[in-house]
Amino acid sequence: MTTSSEDVLLQMGEVRYKKGDGTLYVMNERVAWMAEHRDTVTVSHRYADIKTQKISPEGKPKVQLQVVLHDGNTSTFHFVNRQGQAAMLADRDKVKELLQQLLPNFKRKVDKDLEDKNRILVENPNLLQLYKDLVITKVLTSDEFWATHAKDHALKKMGRSQEIGVSGAFLADIKPQTDGCNGLKYNLTSDVIHCIFKTYPAVKRKHFENVPAKMSEAEFWTKFFQSHYFHRDRLTAGTKDIFTECGKIDDQALKAAVQQGAGDPLLDLKKFEDVPLEEGFGSVAGDRNVVNSGNIVHQNMIKRFNQHSIMVLKTCANVTSAPSTMTNGTNNANGPVSQSAYTNGMNGKGQATATATKSSSDQVDKDEPQSKKQRLMEKIHYVDLGDPILEGDDSANGEKAKSKHFELSKVERYLNGPVQNSMYDNHNDPMSLEEVQYKLVRNSESWLNRNVQRTFICSKAAVNALGELSPGGSMMRGFQEQSAGQLVPNDFQRELRHLYLSLSELLKHFWSCFPPTSEELETKLQRMHETLQRFKMAKLVPFENRAMHELSPLRSSLTQHLNQLLRTANSKFATWKERKLRNTR
C-alpha cells in the first residue's frame, strides 16, 4: 500500500467514498483511501497537489470532508461511524485538524498571474497555438507575447465580468428553522443579502444608517424579518419599526411604475380591470363602476407580488443603464442625491414627490414617440425580409447603430462562407443583333476551309506537353489551388494554417508601427523586424525544407504567399531605414 519511507499518521475506518466503504489513511506526504477487502489504494492525493479542504456545514445529516486540488478536481469522504453523529463528527475533526497541520508544510505557492494566463490560453485555442509557435520556439519572449499579442485578450477577460441576476424566488429560498424555543432561525448567505440589497435599495439604505452605529448585523436582520415591511399581510405596523418608511417608499415607486407603464406604448396597464369568470365566462364585461370588494389582505398580497416583480425587473434594467442612474435616492452608501434621479425611494415628501413624478412623466412623454416607433417596427418587421428602409432622422439611426454590439465567440466559424460559382457569372455586356450576326458570318466563312491533313508531333514535344499539363506545370496554374488542396496532406495543411496565423499576428503589429512618428514606435518597428527574421528562420525555413523532401511538386507553391508577405515587409522596412539615414545626414 505505501512505500517504506511513508508512515501512517492516522488511520480512520468507516469512511465512505463514492458509495463504497473503506479506510482513510493520513500519511507523511499524502492522504489515501482504500476500499474494504482490497490491498490497493483507490484514491491518493499528495499534499502538494491539495489546494484546500472543506467540511460539511453543521446540522447536515451527512458528515463529509472534501479535498480540493489545484486542478479543480475534488474528492469527498463521507464518515459513517456506527456509533452515531457525535462519533462521525469526532472522526472528521481528527482528520481535519491533522490536515490543517500538514498542508501548510506542502503548500504550493501558485502565482495568480500565472493562473490567469493559463486560463486565458485554455479559453482561446488560437492564442494557445500562437504561444506555441512564437514563445516556445523563442521567436518572442514570454513578456513580449503577453505585453503585445495577448494584451487584447487579457483586457477583454478583465472587462467581461457579468452581473449576476436576481432570482424572483430568492426570499422563498430562505427556509427558516426552529431554534427549539418557539423561534425561527434564518440562515442568510452573502448572496441572499446581496439580492435583498439589490432588489430593495431602501433596505440597503437602512442597513447603512443603522449598522453598526445603532445595532449589530444580527439585530438588523432580526428586525427585518420581524418587521411589517417583510410581513405585509399585517394591517398595523409597529411604532418602533424602522422599515415603515421603506413600505411607503415602495408604494410610491409602485404608483410611479404604473403611471410610467410597462415600457410598451401599445399597452396601457391602467385600463386593466378585474372581470370574474362568472360574468359570461369572462367574455362579457360587468359593471365598470362597481368597486371591487375583495378581501383587503388578498389585495395587499397581490400588490406585494406586483411590487416584488417590478423591483426584480428593475435590477435587470439597472445593469444596462448608465452609471448616473440612482437607486433609492442614493448613488452609493454615502448620502442622498437629487429627487429627480430616484428609482426606489426619496428623502423628501410632498413637493419633492410631485417634482420627481413630474420629471418622470415628462421623460416618459419625451421618449414615447421614439419607443412607439420602435414598437411598431417590431410588429411589422420580418427577419427573412431584411431590415426595413426608413426615412427618419439620422440621430435615431446613429443611436441604433451604436447600440449594436457583436462579439464573436469562435471567429473561425464566421470565416467560411458561400463561394460564387463561376458557371453562373452574370456578364453585363449585352450585344446588339447586328453584332451577333456579323460575328456569326465571319466565323462561318472559315468552316469550309479547314485543312484535312493530319500533322504528327515528335515524342519529345508530346512528353513536354504532358509535363506542362500535369499538376505543377505551367498550363495548370489556373487549377493549382484546387489541385494543391487535394494533394497536400492534412498535417501540412494544419501546420500551414498555424504559420499563417502566427505571421499575420506579427505583421499586424509590424504594419501598425507606420508611420513611426515617435521613438517608441521606431523601437517597436526595429524589434518587430527582427522578430520577423527570427520567425522565418525558426518556423518558415524548416517547413519549406520538410515540404521539399515530402511534397516535391508543391514545395515552392505552398510558401510562395508567405514569402511574398515577408518580402513586402522587408522592402518597407528597408525603404524607411534608407529614408531615415538620408534625413539624418
UniProtKB/Swiss-Prot annotation:
Gene Ontology annotations for the cellular component aspect, listed alphabetically: nucleus; transcription factor TFIIH core complex; transcription factor TFIIH holo complex
Assembly notes: Component of the 7-subunit TFIIH core complex composed of XPB/ERCC3, XPD/ERCC2, GTF2H1, GTF2H2, GTF2H3, GTF2H4 and GTF2H5, which is active in NER. The core complex associates with the 3-subunit CDK-activating kinase (CAK) module composed of CCNH/cyclin H, CDK7 and MNAT1 to form the 10-subunit holoenzyme (holo-TFIIH) active in transcription.
One biological process term in Gene Ontology: response to UV
Chain spans, region Disordered: 324-374
Protein name: General transcription factor IIH subunit 1
Biased segments, Polar residues type: 324-362
Organism from which the protein derives: Drosophila melanogaster
Role description: Component of the general transcription and DNA repair factor IIH (TFIIH) core complex, which is involved in general and transcription-coupled nucleotide excision repair (NER) of damaged DNA and, when complexed to CAK, in RNA transcription by RNA polymerase II. In NER, TFIIH acts by opening DNA around the lesion to allow the excision of the damaged oligonucleotide and its replacement by a new DNA fragment. In transcription, TFIIH has an essential role in transcription initiation.
Biased composition (Basic and acidic residues): 363-374
Keywords: DNA damage, DNA repair, Nucleus, Repeat, Transcription, Transcription regulation
A matching Pfam family: PH_TFIIH
InterPro entries: BSD_dom, BSD_dom_sf, PH-like_dom_sf, Tfb1/GTF2H1, TFIIH_BTF_p62_N
Superkingdom to which the source organism belongs: Eukaryota
Residue ranges of domain BSD in the record: 104-159, 180-232
Protein family (similarity comment): Belongs to the TFB1 family.
Gene: Tfb1
Coiled coil stretches, renumbered: none
Annotated localization: Nucleus
